[in-house]
Design a protein with these regions (language model features):
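Motif-centric detector for short Cys/His coordination patterns
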Residues: 1-100
Length: 100
């Protein structure tokens, strides 16, 4: 079944929790999405304080972590998409963290 044309309603994020191993997002329609933190290396390498410092983008369309320069859309979580950051980009980001 092709789901590319399905309109997503009431899928805005309402609450976000980032644990040691998973990212959990509660949606307005009552669902909860949980994905492995390994899907998002910047979150995986972040401190607990950095993970806790998030804000919703727009009316819950996504989540932004200002300390990590990380943005994740609800649509990508629903589609099961992992971070598409390259290994080289992640290495540069990690090296920049060490320099601080």
């Amino acid at each position: 079944m092709d789901t590319s044309g399905i309109e997503l309603k009431d899928t805005s994020a309402q609450h976000v929790a980032v644990g040691e191993d998973s990212l959990t997002v509660d949606l307005a329609d009552g669902r909860t999405i949980a994905v492995p933190l390994a899907w998002f290396p910047r979150l995986l390498h972040a401190t607990a304080a950095e993970r806790a410092n998030w804000r919703l983008i727009g009316p819950g369309e996504g989540i932004h972590w200002p300390d990590l320069d990380e943005d994740i859309s609800v649509a990508s979580l629903l589609a099961g998409r992992r971070s598409n950051e390259t290994g080289e980009s992640l290495r540069r980001w990690l090296d920049g963290r060490k320099a601080k």
